[in-house]
């Protein structure tokens, strides 16, 4: 591939999605070394360049066709799309799939002493946020008038600092809210990391590479969600045992040497095999039960 047809992928330079994005690409066989002083990392084994940028720059880079793919939180993507639509800028991209990391929620929160009934309790109050567009859309849907206080960070300190009456911010565990004397009242948006593609047409070789990377991502995500189960089972309870395996489709059943009354079962399960299920399997005569993670899947 020439320099102009190398695949360009934008990922977060630092922050909660940065390491997971790099880990995902490496799991897909993309080899690269990141120099913290440089914003571009070139793959050692594929015609791929990684651009390490601010997360809120990623949607625009994809929508403007500067990069081909981006890994970004859905909250940032939606916020930027609303902003660009209001300004008449290109706001289209293709969401290829959600990923299995970066889960969070955008929530309203108020001080512990605030007597909150419902969203109308915020009528006329000042709300601090880094997501003014998502907040505005929600409040308009609820028919609530409010005043916004735009902050780029440390939103949770705004009420204590006298800047706002409440906040609208990302929440993962709620520990940060609790530490700042706040409690969550409404979830206005749920978000995961996702991979997006530019709507610009691609040369055949570049699109083929995009398809290959997406296929590998699908395999990596499926593998994380699955377990490989091996066990020995009596033939007389075989149907009951197979029925207990969560999410298993068409398990492989093999005869055991010198034992016509027992078989070996191999299965891929897309759900967790909990201890109580394993105990039920044991009660049905299953033995040598192994539950193992899967590194990669395809097909």
Curated annotation (Swiss-Prot):
Its EC number is 2.4.2.17. It catalyses: 1-(5-phospho-beta-D-ribosyl)-ATP + diphosphate = 5-phospho-alpha-D-ribose 1-diphosphate + ATP. One of its GO terms (cellular component) is cytoplasm. GO terms for biological process: L-histidine biosynthetic process. GO terms for molecular function: ATP binding; ATP phosphoribosyltransferase activity; magnesium ion binding. It is found in: Cytoplasm. Its main location: cytoplasm. Pathway: Amino-acid biosynthesis; L-histidine biosynthesis; L-histidine from 5-phospho-alpha-D-ribose 1-diphosphate: step 1/9. It is an enzyme of class 2 (transferase). PROSITE patterns: ATP_P_PHORIBOSYLTR. Its cofactor is Mg(2+). Keywords: Amino-acid biosynthesis, ATP-binding, Cytoplasm, Glycosyltransferase, Histidine biosynthesis, Magnesium, Metal-binding, Nucleotide-binding, Transferase. Feedback inhibited by histidine. Catalyzes the condensation of ATP and 5-phosphoribose 1-diphosphate to form N'-(5'-phosphoribosyl)-ATP (PR-ATP). Has a crucial role in the pathway because the rate of histidine biosynthesis seems to be controlled primarily by regulation of HisG enzymatic activity. Belongs to the ATP phosphoribosyltransferase family. Long subfamily. PANTHER family: ATP PHOSPHORIBOSYLTRANSFERASE, ATP PHOSPHORIBOSYLTRANSFERASE ATP-PRTASE. HAMAP family: HisG_Long. This is ATP phosphoribosyltransferase. The gene is hisG.
């Amino acid at each position: 591939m020439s320099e102009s047809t190398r695949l360009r992928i934008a990922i977060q330079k630092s922050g909660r999605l940065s390491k997971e994005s790099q880990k995902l690409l490496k799991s897909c066989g993309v080899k690269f070394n990141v120099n913290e002083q440089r914003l571009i990392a070139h793959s050692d084994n594929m015609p791929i360049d990684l651009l390490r940028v601010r997360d809120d720059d990623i949607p625009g880079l994809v929508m403007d066709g500067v990069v081909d793919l981006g890994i970004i939180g859905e909250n940032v993507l939606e916020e930027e799309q609303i902003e660009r639509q209001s300004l008449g800028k290109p706001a289209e991209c293709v969401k290829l799939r959600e990923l299995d990391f970066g889960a969070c929620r955008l929530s309203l929160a108020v001080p512990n002493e605030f007597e909150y009934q419902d969203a109308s309790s915020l009528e006329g109050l000042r709300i601090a946020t880094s997501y003014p567009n998502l907040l505005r859309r929600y409040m308009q849907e609820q028919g609530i008038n409010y005043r916004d206080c735009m902050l780029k960070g440390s939103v949770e300190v705004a009420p204590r600092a006298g800047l706002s009456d409440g906040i609208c911010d990302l929440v993962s565990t709620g520990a940060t809210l609790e530490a700042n004397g706040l409690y969550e009242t409404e979830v206005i948006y749920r978000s995961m990391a996702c991979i997006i593609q530019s709507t610009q047409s691609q040369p055949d070789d570049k699109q083929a590479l995009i398809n290959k990377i997406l296929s590998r991502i699908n395999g990596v995500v499926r593998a994380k969600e699955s377990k490989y189960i091996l066990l020995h089972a009596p033939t007389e309870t075989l149907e009951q045992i197979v029925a207990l395996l969560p999410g298993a489709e068409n398990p492989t059943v093999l005869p055991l040497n010198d034992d016509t009354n027992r078989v070996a079962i191999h299965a891929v399960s897309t759900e967790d095999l909990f201890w109580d299920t394993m105990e039920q399997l044991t009660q049905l005569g299953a033995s040598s039960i192994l539950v193992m993670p899967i590194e990669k899947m395809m097909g």
